[in-house]
From Swiss-Prot:
Gene3D superfamilies in the cross-refs: Peptidoglycan recognition protein-like (3.40.80.10), PGBD-like superfamily/PGBD (1.10.101.10)
GO MF: N-acetylmuramoyl-L-alanine amidase activity
Name of the protein in question: N-acetylmuramoyl-L-alanine amidase CwlA
Catalytic activity: Hydrolyzes the link between N-acetylmuramoyl residues and L-amino acid residues in certain cell-wall glycopeptides
This protein's encoding gene: cwlA
E.C. number: 3.5.1.28
The keyword Hydrolase belongs to this UniProt entry's keyword annotation: yes
Membership in a protein family: Belongs to the N-acetylmuramoyl-L-alanine amidase 2 family.
Length: 272
């Protein structure tokens, strides 16, 4: 049985502030609200305040409420005016994450089912699901991350998607390929070094580090989004380690911020 979505959409008079751009979504981004408000209160507050911050859905223990049309962008991932998270992803807020407990667990359970439903409706696989942290490094969804359950949550979404008869993966690297055609002619041109790269003193520097950074940026895991050259500076510092850590988290690798054989292999597979 499909999950009913209650619509309480932002007024068109506020589109310029909350959702100014038409959008053809390519991802779903999961958030935790970091407060204990209900879905109704989350949407009401989002709609009526003067901040540009916005999101498409809020999910609590009882219902899913929509505040922004899915064919409009929302400002929910902090990766800038033209960032992929803000411009190409559907934002889903899971309520009651501040205190956790029974209500939060029920909200998360409903959100898992709802995200699977969104995937099924669009013919997408689990590879289209992101966490807020993947876009700009923010520690969100905070409760899921602090409890070390991101992979568990993704696995649960995938299981629900299978129950709905959906496919668990989109066409191989289709999104990553599509999104980088304007910035790089061929991903196969990205040579990746062998060996271990990590933060140490003195910091590791040079062309091999630049190669790693360019590969991460090609997949939208920027060392420093918005900085000069998106942080591609040939220095393996904390920001590059964080980009590696976000990449590892997304693809089920050990989240240590260290570039090694397994991280290299996954990067190469996605860049083919």
């Amino acid at each position: 049985m499909a999950i009913k979505v209650v619509k309480n959409l932002v007024s068109k008079s506020k589109y310029g502030l909350k959702c100014p751009n038409p959008m053809k979504a390519e991802y779903i981004t999961i958030h935790n609200t970091a407060n204990d408000a209900s879905a109704a209160n989350e949407i009401s507050y989002m709609k009526n305040n003067s901040s540009s911050t916005s999101f498409h859905f809020a999910v609590d223990d009882k219902q899913v409420i929509q505040g922004i049309p899915t064919n409009r962008n929302a400002w929910h991932t902090g990766d800038g005016t033209n960032g992929t998270g803000n411009r190409k992803s559907i934002g889903v807020e899971i309520c009651y994450s501040k205190s956790g407990g029974v209500r939060y667990k029920a909200a998360e359970k409903l959100a898992i089912k709802f995200v699977a439903q969104l995937l099924k409706e669009r013919g997408w696989g689990i590879d289209r699901v992101r966490k807020h942290q993947d876009w700009n490094g923010k520690y969100c969804p905070h409760r899921i991350l602090s409890e070390g359950r991101w992979i568990q949550v993704k696995t649960a979404i995938e299981a629900e998607l299978k129950k709905l008869g959906g496919k668990t993966n989109s066409s191989k690297a289709s999104v990553a390929k599509k999104k980088t055609t304007n910035t790089s002619s061929k991903k196969t041109s990205y040579a990746l070094p062998s060996g271990i790269f990590k933060v140490k003193s003195p910091m590791m520097r040079g062309e091999k580090v630049t190669q790693i950074q360019k590969a991460l940026a090609a997949l939208y895991f920027y060392p420093d989004k918005g900085a000069k050259n998106n942080g591609i500076d040939g220095v393996y510092g904390p920001k590059t380690a964080d980009a590696i850590r976000r990449f590892q988290s997304m693809y089920g690798l050990t989240q240590d911020g260290i570039y090694g054989p397994k991280t290299k292999a996954k990067l190469e597979a996605l860049l083919k």
